[in-house]
Amino acid sequence: AILCSASWADDRREVWRTLLRARAIENQCYLAGVNRVGTDPDASYAGDSALVDFRGATLADAGEREQTLVAEFDSEAQAAFREEFPAWMDADGFELEF
């Protein structure tokens, strides 16, 4: 699973939601996205913390408030999905040298 903590403002909330789903899908893993709620002198924060599965489906969503989210992660279903769609095999072997 990936844990992604952030401080995305209200005016970018759809970007936040989209990126959570994208990270879960591209890594074929469960993802916990934790975003700030409330306001400060510069911005208002949307919250929208969520638990997302390896297909990009939202398992739990906190909406605009602080909340503890709980969901069951099915590692067998995840492994079966990775076998059916082995995207990791598309990785190129390369090195970055500076």
Language-model features and meaning:
Residues 14, 71-72, 92-94:
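A short, polar/proline- and glycine-enriched secondary-structure boundary/capping micro-motif
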Residues 79-98:
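Cysteine/selenocysteine-centered motifs that mediate thiol-based redox chemistry or coordinate metal-sulfur cofactors
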